[in-house]
Amino acid sequence: MDDTGPRQLTWRWRVLAAIIILAVRVLRWRIEVQGLEHVPARGGAVLAFNHHSYVDFMMVGWPIVRQRRRPMRFLAKREIWSSRKVGWVVRWAGAIPVDRGSDSAREAAFEAATQALQAGDLVAVAPEQTISPSFELLPLRTGAARMAQQAGVPIVPVAGWGSQRALTKGGTKRLIRKLPVTVRFGDAVHVGPDDDVVEVTEELTRRMTRLLHEVQDTYPDGAPPGARWVPARLGGGAPDHAEVLREHTERERGWTRSDPRSADSEDPGRPDGAAGPA
């Protein structure tokens, strides 16, 4: 691992940061950042965040760029590169494209992310791989643990809450003003060269779940009964998590049967914890 110093912000990252800061100020979003001290000031680290909105990576990157003065790379679906609206964002940010329909392409993305970590970059991944309709954690894949192990860097668990009220899959897609958003970074998970990545992922799941419950329980706007953006566990109107898990498992199995090349798709070891629209 190269820990000689943090990568510098390029002019493109500075422009992106300025745009994000302007948007947050115009919308008057109230972003509360907690536990940023857990993010290394130098050297590589995997930032594993929960995926519940289309702007998760921005909420994670906001404090990294603004307060840590470090750029952040992230994994995203290759389809985003062809988007007229946001394609330029992922290109400028140096994001790593993931083609989930090809084993070789997924491995190439995994290697690119590992090399970035070894070079001292921060790499953000969404181990759930897709947005969770229940706003509870879906099963995590082991890609984050594998990357961290191969690169010799820690995993920093991250939980965000609030942005799903504005921009999420199958829900509201409008920019709400004065929206409170909480982003909490937790204690790093360290991965030894001989550690079992499945066990590491189980520990990561426990930590991310704990962080998520903490930010949900302390959210400034509470948990209004029946609200679409509130988990059923808290009395909200989001889909039941058990049903979401069942449908998620069936969808994964169906995808595996339809694409024999992806026989490992039921194995959470696939290195494709892509962020971005799912």
Predicted regions and their residues:
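Non-catalytic C-terminal accessory region of glycerolipid acyltransferases
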Residues: 2-8, 107-278
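Helix-to-loop junction immediately C-terminal to a conserved catalytic motif
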Residues: 12-13, 20-51
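Short, basic, glycine/proline-bearing loop/turn elements
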Residues: 20-21, 92-100, 127-131
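Short, flexible loop segments at the rims of nucleotide/cofactor-binding pockets, characterized by
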Residues: 22-28, 100-103, 133-134
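Glycine-rich, highly charged phosphate/nucleotide-binding loops
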Residues: 29-32, 105-110
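Short acidic-hydrophobic, aromatic-tinged amphipathic segments that line or gate anion-handling sites
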Residues: 33, 96-99, 191
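Generic preference for hydrophobic
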Residues: 33, 47, 74-75, 183-185
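Catalytic core of membrane glycerolipid acyltransferases/transacylases, capturing the structured
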Residues: 40-102
